[in-house]
C-alpha cells in the first residue's frame, strides 16, 4: 500500500500502490486517503492528500474494459454502456507538497475524516450519481420487459413497476438534495 518514505520542508514523498475507484482514469485530480481501519504501527499509511493525475512518478494501471467483450450494444446492453474502469495508482516516489496534504500519519484523524464528518457522503457523490442513472435505466428496462411480455396491465406487475419508479424517483431526489 502507498505510504510515506520521506519528508522534507516541501512535502511528503509517497511510494507504493493504492486501489482507485471508478472514474479515476478520467479524473484530473485524485484524492488519496485510507478508509480501511489501520492497526498500531501503520501510521505511515494514515494519509490524506490530493494530487494531479499527471504528477511526476504517478502511474495508473486500469483494468481491461468490459466493453471489449461486449461489442454489440444489442446483445450486451448493460456491459456495452455501463462499464466502470477501476484502476490502481502506483506512486514511484511521488512528491506531494504540504499544501496538498490534509492528514499526515495520524491514524485517529484518518478514520475520523469519514466516520465523524460527512466527508464519505460527499466523496461518494459520483457513485450516487452513477447508481441513480442505473436505477433509472432499470426502471425503464423493467417497464419494457413487461410491455414485451404483455403483462403491463396485470395489477401485481403495475404495483411492482410503481414501486420501482417511486424508488428511482426517491433516489434521484436524494441525490439532487445533496
Residue locations for each model-derived region?
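Extended amphipathic alpha-helical segments enriched in small hydrophobics
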Residues: 126-178
Amino acid at each position: 500500500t502507498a505510504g510515506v518514505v520521506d519528508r522534507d520542508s516541501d512535502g511528503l514523498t509517497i511510494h507504493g500502490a493504492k486501489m482507485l475507484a471508478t472514474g479515476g482514469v478520467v479524473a484530473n485530480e485524485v484524492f488519496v486517503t485510507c478508509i480501511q481501519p489501520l492497526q498500531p504501527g501503520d501510521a505511515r499509511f494514515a494519509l490524506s492528500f490530493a494530487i494531479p493525475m499527471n504528477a511526476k512518478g504517478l502511474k495508473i494501471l486500469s483494468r481491461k474494459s468490459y466493453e471489449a467483450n461486449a461489442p454489440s450494444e444489442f446483445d450486451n446492453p448493460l456491459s456495452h454502456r455501463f462499464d466502470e474502469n477501476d484502476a490502481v495508482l502506483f506512486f514511484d516516489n511521488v512528491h506531494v507538497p504540504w499544501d496538498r496534504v490534509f492528514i499526515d500519519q495520524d491514524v485517529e484523524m484518518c478514520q475520523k475524516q469519514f466516520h465523524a464528518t460527512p466527508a464519505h457522503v460527499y466523496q461518494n457523490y459520483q457513485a450516487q450519481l452513477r447508481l441513480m442513472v442505473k436505477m433509472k435505466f432499470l426502471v425503464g428496462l423493467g417497464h419494457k420487459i413487461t410491455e414485451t411480455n404483455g403483462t403491463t396491465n396485470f395489477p401485481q406487475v403495475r404495483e411492482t413497476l410503481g414501486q420501482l419508479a417511486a424508488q428511482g424517483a426517491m433516489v434521484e431526489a436524494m441525490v439532487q438534495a445533496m
